[in-house]
Amino acid sequence: MKEIQNPILRGFHPDPSIVRVGRDYYIATSTFEWWPGVRIHHSRDLIHWRLIGYPLTRISQLDLRGVGPSQGIWAPCLTWNDGTFYLVYTVVKAFYCNMYDTENYLVTAQDI
């Protein structure tokens, strides 16, 4: 067995959510105010990762107009059940002191 070194994804990949589907592993990470929304990486060995896409590419899924620095998508959660991937994510529109203006969403897909 090969030794896995942290971080498993080099660079800026906050709030990782990992799911295993058969022999495949997928990680979803936050993108904050950056478009397109949420990064998805894939691996079969937890060592070699490849960016396979951005699931949120339409305004109807992710409207980032008006969000400021460090706002936008926070902490996506990627799961899989009975042949369907589920991605839950929060869009932080604004935050002031201890007050957050957020919206939560769910998107589904049969494959990634």
Language-model-derived ranges and their functions:
Residues 1-112:
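Carbohydrate-active catalytic/glycan-binding domains of CAZyme proteins
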